[in-house]
């Protein structure tokens, strides 16, 4: 990709499925809307985008439609896409990241939405705990970072 300047690339240990195509444009600072819905916005990054995408199937069974936004660039954050989507989904937003919410995507999205009215905000992330070592699947389960938990938090958000 064309970018003059420093960058940080974070990858997962395990292989993950593709939910985008090789033809999809990736522009630094521009989010990708994977799916559009009307009940809530799910903002995810990295492998969490895959888990959130899987959670959409659970939500569909409950007649909930969600917009899924893939944030491949946290800084600069595509505030415009996030804010526009949250406004169109009744102010409901769920942020998903497999990292500490402090200083990460959760905090960046919260900051972007601070001046918006009537926001219902929730996060699936690691909440300021000491890290552990282990297999990826075991760690995700231990921290509640699962498609089931994403769907559960989304349902709670829609019911508020």
Task: For the regions a language model picked out, list residue spans one by one.
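Internal gly/pro-rich beta-alpha loop/helix module
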Residues: 1
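Amphipathic alpha-helical interface segments
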Residues: 5
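Thiamine diphosphate
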Residues: 10-160
């Amino acid at each position: 990709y064309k970018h003059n300047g420093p960058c940080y690339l974070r990858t997962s240990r395990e292989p993950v499925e593709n939910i985008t195509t090789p033809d999809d444009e990736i522009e630094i600072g521009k989010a990708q809307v994977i799916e559009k819905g009307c009940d809530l916005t799910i903002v995810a990054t990295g492998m969490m985008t895959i888990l959130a995408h899987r959670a959409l199937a659970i939500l569909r069974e409950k007649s909930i439609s969600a917009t899924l936004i893939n944030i491949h660039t946290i800084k600069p954050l595509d505030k415009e896409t996030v804010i526009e989507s949250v406004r169109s989904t009744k102010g409901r937003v769920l942020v998903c990241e497999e990292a500490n919410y402090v200083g990460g995507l959760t905090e960046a999205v919260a900051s972007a939405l601070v001046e918006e009215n009537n926001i219902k905000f929730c996060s699936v992330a690691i909440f300021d705990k000491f890290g552990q070592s282990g297999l990826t699947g075991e760690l995700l389960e231990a921290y509640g970072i699962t498609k089931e938990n994403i769907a559960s938090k989304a349902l709670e958000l829609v019911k508020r």
